[in-house]
Amino acid sequence: MTPTRLTGYAHGGGCACKIPPGELEEAVRGLVGQSGENVLVGLDDGDDAAAVLVGDVAVLSTADFFTPVVDDAYDWGRIAAANALSDIYAMGGRPIVAINLIGWPRDVLPLELMTEVLRGGLAVGSEAGCPVIGGHSIDDPEPKYGMAVTGVADPNRLLRNDAAEPGLPLTLTKPLGVGLLNNRHKQTGEVFAEAVATMTRLNRDAAAAAVATGVRAATDVTGFGLLGHLHKMCRASKVGAVIDRAAVPVIEAARDALRDGYVSGGTRRNLDWVRPQLRTATDVTEDDLLLLADAQTSGGLLVVGELPGHPVIGHIVAGAGIDVR
């Protein structure tokens, strides 16, 4: 029996199927500034999660779901769960409860596969110490899965995307390249174990280390790529940044995928959106920029500060824009 290729049932894959950043910002432009008195982090700066003060605790809320990024149902569930939980970690929080969000083409794909997806999500929730309780399902022509997650944090120690300060280093906690490898997997069926391992690894420990060392600014690198998420942070913080492309960690197989043309449409749209903000050295190539704009799924944390064991890839500067060297 031929295994079911879940990625063949989706027009995009993972966070690469996000609505392009420029279009999304235009769609929500009239919705910013609608905050209540207890809202600590709202929609204005497009941070990773909402934060509301309840008593002396910051309650965090986020939702994230996407179409299949790999063909293995259990791994897709694990990846989607790690990706959803990441928004809580990126704010310096601890997830306390999650609910499933799933769309399933029930007349096309067996429900046993849906069970495997949910089982993968439950496994990662258990690893995170976050109960996964129920959720919501719909009959959907395209399979989709993710979670809505609630977390808690110290309101005085939140990691925010509007708190970057000039002079501080930039650290990245996971390698880039999973977007390229996921696109190659979708088109060829090749399985890249390193990409799956990266996407299923929780950002919990990196976030805890950042909070413990007094970091104030961070975000996670997902569908808008490193350059896109860095641009959002710089814009929110009213600063600029310098990136040393040679210092950016990359899954080695992704370089081959880039050479062979497995660049997603989402990655190209990311680069189109952020290009006006870039200043590049003369030896920086278009392929360099495509790699830095690669649409990640369950990527690492981009931290303004140093974290032991993770590479410094640049620094924050006064001014605006991003220098790529």
Q: Model features per residue range: what roles?
A:
Residues 1-90, 165-171, 311-315:
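N-terminal glycine-rich phosphate/pyrophosphate-binding loops that anchor nucleotide-derived ligands
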Residues 73-99, 116-127, 202-213, 226-232:
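Small-aliphatic-rich amphipathic alpha-helix that forms the alpha element of a beta-alpha
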Residues 1-12, 23-26, 37, 106-131, ...:
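Glycine-/charge-enriched secondary-structure boundary and capping motifs
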Residues 74, 191-198, 216-217, 287-292:
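Short pre-catalytic strand/loop immediately N-terminal to key active-site residues, enriched for Gly-Thr
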Residues 54-70, 78, 94-191, 315:
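Glycine-rich anion-binding loops of enzyme active sites
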Residues 148-158, 190-211, 284:
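Active-site glycine-rich loop that binds ribose-phosphate moieties when present
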